[in-house]
Regions:
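Short acidic, glycine/serine/threonine-rich loops at helix termini
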Residues: 1-3, 23-29, 82, 105-107, ...
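Glycine-rich phosphate/diphosphate-binding loop of Rossmann-like nucleotide-binding domains
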Residues: 1-65
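Rossmann-fold NAD(P) dinucleotide-binding segment
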Residues: 56-68, 76-93
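Beta-loop-alpha module in the N-terminal Rossmann-like domain of NAD(P)-dependent dehydrogenases
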Residues: 73-81, 101-104
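Adenosine-phosphate binding glycine-rich loop
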Residues: 87-167
Length: 167
């Protein structure tokens, strides 16, 4: 969410295992971090704190109109029925942020219907690459700035994208 916002994206929905929040003005990450990291609360508290935000219990976050959908939690959370709703709502890109959150049937349907699909093995590579960059720093006793790490990570992700796009 943080990287999406940093790159100019407007994240309007987010879920946990109990339900999802929707904020048409864009999720306020500082409030989510306070709820989840500081208070160890549930995401539904966001709707109590932010005017105009709503909370919906249970599944169904894919019912919200979006350009990009990032399934980042549960294995097989995106099935055929869910991706049909996403496509009907205008989704053009799905990038997995979890281990196999999209069923094979749903993946095939996304690609057959012109949705750009980034599998988790490629999309999650940023976390693995960042860990590798940290290991390089530690072994060489270097200290890169966050901007230097981000620049190196950006090039790694561009290379991965090009390889996936060529496949």
């Amino acid at each position: 969410v943080e990287k999406a916002a940093e790159l100019g994206g407007k994240v309007v929905a987010m879920c946990d295992s109990n339900g999802y929040i929707y904020d048409p003005e864009g999720i306020k990450l500082d409030i989510v971090k306070d709820i989840k990291e500081v208070k160890r609360g549930r995401i539904k508290e966001y709707a109590d704190r932010v005017e105009g935000a709503t909370y919906t219990e249970g599944k169904g976050i894919w019912n919200i109109k979006c350009d990009i959908y990032l399934p980042c939690a549960t294995q097989n959370e995106l099935d055929l029925d869910a991706v049909k709703i996403l496509i009907a709502n205008g989704c053009k890109y799905v990038a997995e942020g979890a281990n196999m959150p999209t069923t094979r049937e749903a993946t095939d349907y996304l690609m057959a219907n012109g949705v750009t699909f980034m599998p988790g093995k490629a999309a999650n590579a940023g976390g693995v690459a960042t860990s590798a960059l940290e290991m390089c720093q530690n072994s060489a006793r270097l200290s890169w700035t966050a901007e230097e790490v981000d620049t190196k990570l950006h090039q790694i992700m561009v290379d991965i994208f090009n390889k996936v796009d060529d496949a």
